[in-house]
Amino acid sequence: MVHAPARSEDIREEVAELLGVDVDAVQPGSNLIGQGLDSIRIMTLAGRWRRRGIAVDFATLAETPTIEAWAQLVTAGRQDTDSAAPPADSSGDPSGETEPFALAPMQHAMWVGRQDNQQLGGVAGHLYVEFDAGLLDSGRLRAAATALARRHPMLRVRFLPDGTQCITPAVECGDFPVHVEDLRELGTDEVERRLTALREAKSHQQLDGAVFELTVTLLPGGRSRLHVDLDMQAADAMSYRTLMADLAALYRGCDLPELSYTYRQYRHAVEAQDAQPQPRRDADRDWWARRLPELPDPPALPITAGRGANRSTRRWHWLDPQTRDALFARAQARGITPAMALAAGFANTLARWSSNSRFLLNVPLFGRQPLHPDVDALVGDFTSSLLLDVDLVGAHTAAARAQVVQDAMRTAAAHSAYSGLSVLRDLSRHRGTQVLAPVVFTSALGLGELFSPEVTGQFGTPAWIISQGPQVLLDAQVTEFDGGVLVNWDVREGFFPPGVIDAMFAYHIDELLRLASADDAWDAPGPAALPEAQRAVREAINGRTAPPSGEALHDRFFRQAERQPDAPAVFAGSGDLSYAQLRDQALAVAAALRAAGAGAGDTVAVVGPKSAEQIPAVLGILSVGAAYLPIGADQPRDRAERILQSGRVRLALVCGGRQLSLPVPGLVLADVLGGAPADAEIACARVDPGELAYVLFTSGSTGEPKGVEVTHDAAMNTVEFIGRHFEIGPADRCLALSTLEGDISVMDVFVTLRTGGAIVVVDEAQRRDPDAWARLIDTHRVTVLHFMPGWLEMLVEVGRGRLSSVRVVPTGGDWVRPEVVRRLRAEAPGLRFAGLGGATETPVHNTIFEVTEPIPADWTALPFGVPLPNNVCRVVGDTGGDCPEWVPGELWVSGRGIARGYRGRPDLTAQRFVEHDGRTSYRTGDLVRYRPDGTLEFVGRADHRVKISGYRVELGEIESALRRVPGVRTAVAALIAGAGESDVLAAQVGTDDPALTGEQVRQYLADLVPAHMIPRHVAVVERIGFTAAGKLDRRAVARELHSVVGQSHSPGHRAASTPLEGALALILGDLLGRDDVGVDDDFFALGGDSVLATQAVARIRAWLDAPDVMVADMFANRTVSALAAVLRAAEDDPDRLDHVAELYLEVIGMDAESVLTATRQTTKS
């Protein structure tokens, strides 16, 4: 028995041994982190001492890292009652060495995760290495490998379908196969081609039956390449080092000491130990349980839609000894261990490329309990894991980030008696869906060189290394190599957009080199995550400028009226107007306003139904230097009065020919238009472009409308661009559908009139009638449509044969389906179509994407495009930095085209209009991302970001995936309050396919998004309605979905209707600890996990005589009804299982005496 350290000197000796230094180099009062002790080795000591009966933990040791402090902690912690229990029997059962035994927790996770139906599954835990050597003797290597397989039973392991493993006796295995590829007679190019093909085949294979494979390629010039492939379900990374060291020794002809202990015995002893009372483990489990509701998601890295390729790729960089020493010394001077310095650099890179800067990081641990002297020489899986809750939101320097990560490591390690894998299973049960931690940081610092001199001496230098693991996206590894540190990333690259991993890795390495080079780099803000090439693209597309005209919105109209007085300006059902007539009406409005005391700096409301008379009203208001504020006819009276008051309205012009009772003075517009016009010189009076032009009230999140103040110059940036870009002129006719309250009306009125075109007015009676729009387009040969996407959807449904005159369609404000573009161009060949992004606060548009080429078939919506001239668009992450390509963040717009702020709301203005780098930016609340070509892509709205099963999810991302389902035109996702349960994700889709079902949509989504993003309910309708503003009517959809969800819960769960369903419900309910499992209930949503699924399969096989059922069946068929259907389908006689289930149900209902009596009767018969 190993005794606990009793003196400081004993502790010094243990620390010196771990550091690989002389004991005199370890000073009692010195900071051990500064002397090279890292987190992993502190954890090793903590675990070692706890097993010796000393109550210490990693966090306490790490907080006071000196020999003197540790001696006091060890003395005080000797009476640990947790470890005072009698030690578990470590001998195991050697006589049963070939009997099946349970998988270790990490083995089980890999066994389940490698199945194709798992998230990020379909691959094995796998390590592949190539060594370049001289001429290897394949016969000697075969003999060495045969001896190696006899020495290590886990090289002869078989993984059984029931989730157990067993060892094949050595006598049944024969010689270990060593494959030989002879390429000595081939030319250089062919040799390289064959080596590449061999690497491609072996580096991603799933070994079938074998867990260890050796291949020797004989090369020209007396050279060889050794290919080593290991299934890591059989042996972890530390075991790989043991295997290669033993293989090298056996190849040299050395005799290795016999092992008197096996991995199977070790697992037996650990399980026996785990079965004993474990107060520390129970306390740590309770600690994690309290934290489950607040644990974050994994890093939300940019992932491509659909299922990516299973192949892994590697990025690597070698930090030479000088760089390593400088980096580690600077870290240790700040009390940061080397491993945590490297982990912090990795975490910072993740935060820069993630839409969440607080995330879960998976940290594997290599730890073997000292249950036998031979434990360190064994091969098997000894790994566990920690989950780190990393929060870098407020950490703006490298030193701060390193401290955050180190603190997170200490916190997790202080509660490591309950493993990270167990926490993930609990978190999955808590959220009702499978939770993964697919981003991994693996530190092998302190474990010695990756390949010992003995290994490289026999087999040569490593030429290629790659690993992969099931349910892992990115595994960052740091290990000691060739005197320095090797930094590797093994990545499932097919899941990421092109270029993302290269940019991330380059940023990571650049930061490590920067921190190694200078002390002040630790205390300065980190560099922006934008690689130079990305920065150049951003600067180019944001650097486009166009000289402003210096005009107010109405100026050019009055000049056009002088130039072409008889040209048509307005076509309306109430009567057409020439430019001269429209000018006179506008001046009549101006005269009436002046007579009423309204002028420069005032705000005048335009109240009432949409009509042609509103056009001279706004022109007259602007001509006297006032700003207009529209209030439509469908505004509730209370809301209209609040707008008039908060809008500080001086006077109201009332449309529709009738006086209203208003809280402000009012003039009937029909009366005003017939009055005498003001002096002509008023049309030439200069209004400063910096003055307000209009105030538009939009819905506020608090329920109180907010008034956006827009200057002439801000609006003119878009007006001038649209007119110039689309070459709009006197021959054009614009159909004005938008009400004045919608900012698209600014385009309808001012783009058209400043360029000499004519406005075709859609009045109040027509604005909800798409057929009327089509008639007006056809009658007046309309050429320009400033339409919302929803209006276009309605128009193409009814406009066939009547849209040929249309030549320009700028649209925006909602998702724009490519199909709309195709249908419009079928009606109007040569049509110029553009999707534009924008907001009332960035009047009217801030980006443009003109469709000039065929739209790719996989696009579900048009992107926002590139910024308009004089605008700058930033995509900002939650740390305040610019997001790299493909990473979503909030769109911030600055430049000429932004509003002044919110009327009477300085608090809201300060919140949304922020100062940054000397300029004012408007925070749009739109979630967007930059593509590599500088195109902005709309992802969703920040206010559509919801929590689903504990995950933060963009509803827009779900809607985008829904639109990828064949047959789906439009989609709206919503979070609906469930009946007596947590909120439910639901969706409504519009389709032309009458055969499409909600379940089919859900099944298709399984290949596009994770399980937690698949709506529980999908309602299929012929079409989703639009609001009067031309946007998808989300409120109406939410009401309909609420009804659907409520109806689905009202009857309660469906009970079993057959004996088989009853038996399955009973088996699953027993494992879940509940007696109310319905046949449609999701096993995993009720708290099931991979371990319980394995147990369920074992019981179903044994108790229902269904030997072919697999764990994969449980994951693919998550309900009792679905599982019963699969079991029946596999039977020649589908009724047989019901008979077996009847017997099971009968037996399970008997007491012990009844079972014994029945058994005796059966035996006699």
Swiss-Prot record:
Residues 5-78, 1055-1131 form the Carrier domain. Pathway: Siderophore biosynthesis; mycobactin biosynthesis. It is an enzyme of class 6 (ligase). Residues 77-100 are annotated as: Disordered. Keywords: Ligase, Multifunctional enzyme, Phosphopantetheine, Phosphoprotein, Repeat. Binds 2 phosphopantetheines covalently. It comes from the Bacteria. Pfam families: AMP-binding, Condensation, PP-binding. GO terms for biological process: amino acid activation for nonribosomal peptide biosynthetic process; lipid biosynthetic process; secondary metabolite biosynthetic process. The modification O-(pantetheine 4'-phosphoryl)serine is found at S39, S1090. Involved in the initial steps of the mycobactin biosynthetic pathway. Putatively couples activated salicylic acid with serine or threonine and cyclizes this precursor to the hydroxyphenyloxazoline ring system present in this class of siderophores. Modular protein that contains an aryl carrier protein (ArCP) domain which bears a phosphopantetheinyl arm to attach the activated salicylic acid, a condensation/cyclization domain involved in the formation of the oxazoline ring, an adenylation domain which activates the serine or threonine residue into an aminoacyl-AMP ester, and a peptidyl carrier protein (PCP) domain which bears a phosphopantetheinyl arm to attach the activated serine or threonine. Belongs to the ATP-dependent AMP-binding enzyme family. MbtB subfamily. This is Phenyloxazoline synthase MbtB. It comes from Mycolicibacterium paratuberculosis (strain ATCC BAA-968 / K-10). The lineage of its organism: Bacteria, Bacillati, Actinomycetota, Actinomycetes, Mycobacteriales.
